[in-house]
Amino acid sequence: MEKPSTLLVHFDKGSAAMAGEIKADLEGSDVAAKVDAMKRAVMLLLNGETLPTLFITVVRYVLPSEDHTIQKLLLLYLEIIDKRDAAGRGLPEMILICQNLRNNLHHPNEYIRGVTLRFLCRLSEPEVLEPLVPSILENLDHRHHFIRRHALSAISSIYRLPHGDQLVPDAPELVERALASEQDASARRNAFLMLCTCAQERAVAYLLSNADRVAEWPDLLQMAAVDLIRKVCRSPNRADKGRYIKIIIALLSSPSTAVVYECAGALVSLSSAPTAVRAAANTYCELLSSQSDNNVKLIVLDRLNELRTSHRDVMVDVVMDVLRALASPNLDVKRKVLDLVLDLLTARNVEEVVLYLKKEVVKTQAGELEKSGEYRQMLVQAIHACAVEYPEVAGSVVHLLMDFLGDTNVAAAVDVVLFVREIIETNPKLRVSMIQRLIDTFYQIRASRVCSCALWILGEYSLSLSEVENAISTIKQCLGDVPFYTVSEEGEATDSAKPAQPVVNSVTVSSRRPVVLADGTYATQSAATEAISTPSVAPGSLSSTLNLRSLILSGDFFLAAVISCTLTKLVLRLEEVQPSMVEVNKACTGALLVMTSILQLGQSSYLPHPIDNDSYDRIVLCVRLLCNTGDDVRKVWLQSCRQSFAKMLAEKQFRETEEMKAKAQISHAQPDDLIDFYHLKSRRGMSQLELEDEVQDDLKAATGGFTKDAYDANRLNRILQLTGFSDPVYAEAYVTVHHYDIVLDVTIINRTKETLQNLCLELATMGDLKLVDRPQNYTLAPESSKQIRANIKVSSTETGVIFGNIVYETSNVMERSVVVLNDIHIDIMDYISPATCADVTFRNMWAEFEWENKVAVNTVIQNEKEFLDHIIKSTNMKCLTPPSALDGECGFLAANLYAKSVFGEDALVNISIEKQFDGKLSGYIRIRSKTQGIALSLGDKITLKQKGGS
């Protein structure tokens, strides 16, 4: 088929036989058969068939029919048939339908008139339309609004044709007159849109003359008015912008939520005045609370986030209104609300925000909400962020959050214990109460990771005599009686805490597999140490207070090593604060008994798997230390660990501060840019809003708010040459990548002395790319150029390729000439941007994502840090590993990189490299993602770039 088909429908019968049957049915008198025949004819035409002999039959036997269904199908048939010949001239037989269309325009039935007028909106042949214009104009005064509505649409369509102003020269005057007297909402909208498109001055005059009554207009007309205001105010330095802003503010009280939403967006685009921005923000907040559709809430939150980036000072005042959207049951909405609120925190509103979040935490505790565990985790993270930025609010929430250390949602419990660890270091005033609360609630903790962190806190921050003694006592209570098992006379191993209950069957078998540590390296540990859920043990083996014992009996020797280290620290601390050496020796003996019992359990056949070497060495070190303590070792154990943690927090705060400074120092305007001083302007007759708007415009000009950076000199560095200089047609393109589409601006130059006819840029794609526009033919004069724009839709981050040809004809050559274009490769770097996430989130995603691309390191670079910097620059990713962890020369480096795509996809990269004896680097770069495309594309990019190429 030569022409592109809009619809493909399979027919079992041949088209020739089908055409004969259609013709026979149309010539008959059976109305039902005619309807069926017309439907089949329309399907065949849409399927690419021509049916050239059918037109006369339709004119003779279908045009006179009075049946409404047949008339509707007839108009559809007339719309899709070819009305022009190969040379582009109108077919003479089209005149045959003019009389029928004129009769329909005077038909007594309103439906026939209306559908005929609607059909004329889709005609573009002046030969057919010209004799019908008087009849169309007569329908402007018809009593029925259905006919007037479509008559206005028909006039608008005709006037927009290339020579439409000659067919209906007085159309704007007629439509304006009709608009003044029209009462139907749809008809008024059609008339107003016609004026907006074809006679904008008349539309503006009508809008301004009815400015006081715009709020009473129907919502369809109000939407059209908002669109007109947007279009009119795009021109710079409009003196009457204040009048349009008043209209927009009046429309904010419209009962239509669609109008209100559009008005809020228009108001922000028209004015930077605080009053206008505040009105828009309040409108968005009202929509956020009144709309039940989650998609609407997400869209409104996006608009509020855009306001935050440019008008943060105004948005701070509506933070509590935004928080009310947490009432939505949707977690995505809650997450966006919390992210937005955290960016709007100030010393003035942080207490109110934390109080609200505290109430939400209590709701999750009461079980009132769905997915309360996930929601509680989000709330804990939000409160953590508030307390880090404003430490004075930590005291009001930390004790409430510590009740969730034993939460069944392990992720939420981990967030709580990390929050406690940071607050107890940064807020020394809360240390005493937090240690006491942790000791009181320690028995509730069921997750191994939470226990490990809580034990570290007890070991580092229990300073007074009572705190140290209580901490040791609590740990021993949670461990139960030692040794952990006894061997009976029959040789059967039993739990010493449950002498009558055999527990061999109650032990959870722990599988061993590699896990990802915080620095991105791999390590082997038992699955029980991950504590994804509460350990599964037999009934009777898990007591409410023996949480540590249960975890150790499940094979968690990593936790056992942490317990040993904590007891060692507490005994060393007790030596400093306890004057009685008898008590010190008693505590030391108890700690040694616990450690030796753990070693005995780990080396016995009681558990399916023995203790791992790392844990064994760690516990043995603790035993030796308690038996022979030196001052240097004591200093390392009691001071260095806490100092390292404090240093880590300080570095984290420093990095965040430096990032904020870097963002604040970006220059948006040049020193010699023009600034207008509003004090020198006349203020006579200006409202308060107009005065504010003038001030804000001047400030934006001074700070670069109006600067456009999308089109600059850097575009010249990205021009792609598509053909050679010796080709008769030279072509080059600039590729602009937007979020979901690619725009190709192609410049074509005719380098010959001949006119190129039917020149067509034919493009094709490979990958997840799709052409939006159909190719068009152009005529190119000798040595002239043509700009052609092609739009390509993108659906994923997979690497795509655009290829094609330029086809043209000349008068000297009968055949078409073809110039093959160079391929255009779409770079994944255009779709991903650096992002940041917590270490816990990174590890969870790493474990969850199934697609991994493993790239071997092959580079001429010999410095580990230099190679890492090169990969970061080449992949446009963010390094999550702190700089302090990368300092020094140890011959080994491990780092995590992270980025997000415009489609919301996560890209995770782990680099593990070491320096060989010959100075070369070896190792692997692992890429993980949820989809295959981004993993493969990023791997190809790294393979190409890692050798140090550009």
UniProtKB/Swiss-Prot annotation:
Protein name: Coatomer subunit beta-2
Keyword Cytoplasm: yes
Membrane association type: Peripheral membrane protein
Compartments in which it is found: Cytoplasm; Golgi apparatus membrane; Cytoplasmic vesicle, COPI-coated vesicle membrane
One MF term in the entry's GO annotations: structural molecule activity
Domain of life: Eukaryota
Organism for this UniProt entry: Oryza sativa subsp. japonica
GO biological process, one term: intracellular protein transport
